[in-house]
């Protein structure tokens, strides 16, 4: 039976963002910060995409569970997401692992990260829970997923991507019937099941789940009492519901948000150096796959009061310039040339230097006569004069973190070891 609606379902929902992961495949980039706190797109943090989706979808109650090296993430949330008004029935809760349920345990898994705050969730009295991963780049209207959940009468609705079948081996994969009811859920299968009518494609979990709140609370209490459980949604909660209840797949193509310039549904896991670099560099294209300029679906974030970017010097061999690049506020390009690069706030690039396919995080200083190609430079790094990266693969690999595709991650610790 379809429920009668007098207001958007999102107004009776809470978004709960799981943001405690390290993101170890990003190597030194997450030595000082959790993966959701990693910078993206010249201005934002990765977590801002899930949070902006929730806000733009109409959800006004949000909780964020943090754990690994959470200081920079918590500071960002406190500064950039402090505009919710309790008198308007809005809330934004930052929920660090604090041993609320057990004096000896931190968050043991994704399900436990929700269970340990079960009293806070129940105090909000919402009808629906939208569980989100805080470490993916995408634009999605969760209201449409909530509508499908209610209309289908599902116990859980799982957001999913259609991916080539043999590329789905690293995901949780859903085997569905012709009505997208999930009949099996397999974590990282060697031979993923195909989609009915399209056997070369598979449905991969996005780590997005919609529940009726009471049902989820019952499932979490049951799971917490099971000594064999690993306290994880993908390994424990979802397989149990698939077997004993009704689980339905929600295809991302049904709720992805696209501007007039976006042709395909865009979702990225920027969990490796190569994927992170590529997703940022893609934004420099004339028509990027992800439109961050879409004013109808803004990506909210903390925005410091900074002066505009500045380009100085106009001599033949010393001209401040940028082509096919994104340059954020408070950057000074002093007689240097940028091509297909993305600079976050506060970057200084000094004379005669050249950057190509470079992702430069905030407050970096690049010395004169430097040539940097295919790099990710961590925040607050000081690049010495005359440094060349991107010409000699063997030398680059000895000095920096060089990826499979030849992208060099540069940190201050690596620079200090050069002795330049």
Curated annotation (Swiss-Prot):
Top enzyme class: transferase
One of the record's GO molecular function terms: glucose-1-phosphate adenylyltransferase activity
A Gene Ontology biological process term: glycogen biosynthetic process
Pathway where it operates: Glycan biosynthesis; glycogen biosynthesis
Known catalytic reactions: alpha-D-glucose 1-phosphate + ATP + H(+) = ADP-alpha-D-glucose + diphosphate
InterPro entries: ADP-Glc_PPase (IPR011831), ADP_Glu_pyroP_CS (IPR005836), GlgC_bac (IPR023049), GlmU/GlgC-like_hexapep (IPR056818), NTP_transferase_dom (IPR005835), Nucleotide-diphossugar_trans (IPR029044), Trimer_LpxA-like_sf (IPR011004)
Residues annotated for alpha-D-glucose 1-phosphate binding in this entry: 107, 172, 187-188, 205
UniProt key word Nucleotide-binding: yes
Keyword Manganese found: no
Pfam family, one: Hexapep_GlmU
Keyword annotations: ATP-binding, Carbohydrate metabolism, Glycogen biosynthesis, Glycogen metabolism, Nucleotide-binding, Nucleotidyltransferase, Transferase
EC number: 2.7.7.27
Classification via Gene3D superfamilies: Hexapeptide repeat proteins, Spore Coat Polysaccharide Biosynthesis Protein SpsA, Chain A
Role noted for this protein: Involved in the biosynthesis of ADP-glucose, a building block required for the elongation reactions to produce glycogen. Catalyzes the reaction between ATP and alpha-D-glucose 1-phosphate (G1P) to produce pyrophosphate and ADP-Glc.
Family assignment from sequence similarity: Belongs to the bacterial/plant glucose-1-phosphate adenylyltransferase family.
Subunit structure of this chain's protein: Homotetramer.
Protein name: Glucose-1-phosphate adenylyltransferase
Organism (species): Sinorhizobium fredii (strain NBRC 101917 / NGR234)
């Amino acid at each position: 039976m379809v429920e009668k609606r007098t207001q958007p379902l999102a107004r009776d929902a809470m978004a709960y963002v799981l943001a405690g992961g390290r993101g170890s495949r990003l190597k030194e980039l997450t030595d000082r910060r959790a993966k959701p706190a990693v910078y993206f797109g010249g201005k934002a943090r990765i977590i801002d995409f899930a949070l902006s989706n929730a806000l733009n979808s109409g959800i006004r109650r949000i909780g964020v569970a943090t754990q690994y090296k959470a200081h920079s993430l918590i500071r960002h949330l406190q500064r950039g997401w402090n505009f919710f008004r309790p008198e308007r029935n809005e809330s934004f809760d930052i929920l660090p692992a604090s041993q609320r349920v057990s004096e000896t345990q931190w968050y043991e898994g994704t399900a436990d990260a929700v269970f340990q705050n079960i009293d806070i969730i129940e105090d909000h009295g919402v009808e629906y829970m939208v569980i989100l991963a805080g470490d993916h780049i995408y634009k999605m209207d969760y209201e449409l997923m909530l509508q499908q959940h209610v209309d289908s009468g599902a116990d859980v609705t799982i957001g999913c991507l259609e991916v080539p079948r043999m590329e789905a081996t690293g995901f949780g994969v859903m085997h569905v019937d012709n009505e997208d009811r999930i009949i099996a859920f397999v974590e990282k299968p060697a031979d993923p099941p195909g989609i009915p009518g399209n056997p070369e494609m598979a449905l991969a979990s996005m780590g997005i789940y919609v529940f009726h709140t009471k049902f989820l609370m019952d499932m979490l209490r049951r799971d917490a009492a099971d000594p064999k459980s690993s306290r994880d949604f993908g390994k424990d909660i979802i397989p149990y519901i698939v077997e004993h209840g009704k689980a339905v797949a929600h295809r991302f193509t049904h709720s992805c948000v696209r501007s007039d310039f976006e042709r395909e549904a865009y979702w990225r896991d920027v969990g490796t150096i190569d994927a992170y670099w590529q997703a940022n560099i893609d934004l420099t294209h004339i028509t990027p796959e992800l439109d961050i300029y879409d004013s109808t679906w803004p990506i909210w974030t903390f925005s410091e009061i900074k002066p505009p970017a500045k380009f100085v010097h106009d001599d033949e061999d010393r001209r401040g310039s940028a082509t096919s690049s994104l340059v954020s506020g408070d950057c000074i390009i002093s007689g240097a040339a940028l091509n297909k690069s993305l600079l976050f706030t506060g970057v200084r690039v000094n004379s005669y230097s050249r950057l190509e396919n470079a992702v430069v995080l905030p407050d970096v200083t690049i010395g004169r006569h430097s040539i940097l190609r295919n790099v990710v430079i961590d925040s607050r790094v000081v690049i010495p004069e005359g440094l060349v990266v991107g010409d000699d693969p063997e030398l680059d690999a000895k000095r920096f973190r060089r990826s499979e595709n030849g992208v060099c991650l540069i940190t201050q610790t690596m620079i200090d070891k050069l002795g330049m």
